[in-house]
Amino acid sequence: RLISKINPVNVIVDPILISGTQENLSSIKMIQAMKNYLFPKSLLLTPNLEELNLLAPGLTEQEAVKSLNCGWILVTTSDSSKIDIEHRLYNKSTLVRKFKYKKIPGKFHGSGCTLSSAISALLVKGADIEEACDQGLAYTYQCLLNAKKLGKMQYHPIRTPYKP
């Protein structure tokens, strides 16, 4: 309801449904509420592939994207079995662009919020959605390349000023 009251507003949603240690952080009721009330009012959704599968189980990636009823969806991937990873930007159910990066080894905490924050900042500065996703991914990649491990925990992105 709050988002409806302050429209127009560009809402970017990072649906944190799974922790970096693969712990489920969601419930069916919460997912349904996000799908019904939040996603249709959002400009961009940034799920990783595992979260997309939780949001729309049993569907292909393109079917899942279409079912979420959000204008733009940036699906991020981190398949550990591959050398290269590919993120995909959709407008409705149409694949608009693929972004390819070399896989960075390790487990990370904070990559999704780094990405969504970077995209938000770029949109505020006037970038269009495709440019904001491109530069936001590049910034996040640099932060992950410089990530530090705290003890035996996951790596944490080092968020420093970065100019693409």
What feature does the model see in each segment?
Residues R1-Y37:
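Glycine/small-residue-rich loop that forms an oxyanion/phosphate-binding "nest" at active or ligand-binding sites
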Residues L17-S19, E51, T77-S80, K102-P105, ...:
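Glycine-rich beta-alpha junction loops
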Residues N24-V96, E130:
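Conserved phosphate/ATP/ADP-binding segment of small-molecule kinases
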Residues L95-H109:
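Short pre-catalytic strand/loop immediately N-terminal to key active-site residues, enriched for Gly-Thr
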Residues L95-R97, L122-G136:
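Phosphate-handling active-site elements
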Residues P105-I129:
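Short, small-residue alpha-helix embedded
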Residues E130-P164:
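Charged C-terminal helix
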